[in-house]
Amino acid sequence: MTMLSTKTLVYGLGESGLSAARALAERGYAVTAADAADSENARASAAALGEFGVQARLGAGPEVLEGVDRVVVSPGVPPGAPVLRAAEERGVPVLSEVALGLELLGSEVRVAAVTGTNGKTTVADMARRILEEAGLGHVVAGNSWTAITGKLEEIRSAGRLVLEVSSFQLHYMRDPGFEAAALLNVRPDHMNWHASFEDYAADKQRIFGGQSENDLALLGARDPVCAEAAEGLSARAVLVGEGGTRVEDGCLYLEGERLVRVEDLGFAGRHNHENALFAAALARSLGASAEEIRRGLEGYRMKPHRMEVVAERGGVLYVDDSKATNPAAVAAALAGLQRPVVLLLGGSEKHTDFSEVADYLGGCRAVVCYGEAGGRISDFLDSWSESRAEILRASGLEAAVREAEARARDGDVVLLSPGCASFDEFSGYEERGEEFARLCRAGLAEVQRGAAGA
């Protein structure tokens, strides 16, 4: 059987599923598509695929596997979905859209890949900035970026790919053999998708599959899962945060070479400085020099909703860290602040453990717990006897901002670092962050109007 005659089912008609089906159809592969839903969005996706000659079945069950040789699955489809369980029982291979994209690219492109519970989008973005500064052709794709199958010709032309991959995408990937691969950290997250933390950690470590001794593996030195994983790798392993690749005496060092002073960077926080080291190592693997890395990092500015100052009034800073959707990210944010904090925690429930956040409550004046998960979080923090922070409850984000404003004092930081997903109120962390900024700026406008009328 030739690859062109291999019949592929693309299951899940989100952005990556649409991209995968189009890429296969445009290249003459036999492809069908399906989705468990029969919603307005699914029907729109099916209509779009019809223009490429791809038939799509909606409200589909395991019957769509009839005559199928393999399945390409969208990241939003959990492993326990009936179609995927049936595929496993029948021995039908399942792969992610990213794995399909790498297959279609072949070996002609140099790939530097990054994953981790927190920081992977930032690292990919920093690497992008460095490669731009170096004038090296590249494409950034995967997870938070454009689907890889939608950029195949552009990637081939550039010759270099910075690839951000999630645990969902890695779950259905076998031995990708990346020239450089980074695992930043592994903390409990997405436990509603993975069977256990051990399974989640194992999926993250798939990023190192298929590497040889000539390849580079980067791992977070301060993360216990990463430190243990480093011991059994085939590639050359570098622990970021200790040894030659570290932050020390106000400088960033990459494998013993001083790169840049922290004071010359446009972003703060130890976790972000270590993110910069990961990005520097990935960019160097793709051909960037030390001087190009320095200039790239000095010119880098953080993406929105990542410790972004959105307002300041009465000596209080209002900081949007809406991208912090798990407790480990909240802990990292609190560890990087030197001022008293009024913290906003909450959102949609993922049943994660907030013990790591509780360890940092000594720097908090108050914690406002809100949304669907707010009750559980506030009950847990109330029981944490070592904390002197005032624990408050609010119904939603707007009420939480008002509570925070009432308690913040000159010199404080009001920090939205929710530690939860946003879907109880918003479409995603971006909309949540934008609403937080709007509320904070609206409060500033009210103060200014009051001052003008005084």
Model-identified regions with their sequence ranges:
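Nucleotide phosphate-binding/pyrophosphate-handling subdomain across enzymes
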Residues: T2-K7, S19-R27, E108, V260-A366, ...
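Beta-strand->loop->alpha-helix junctions that form or flank phosphate-binding loops
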Residues: T32-D35, L58-A60, L95-L100, S234-D249, ...
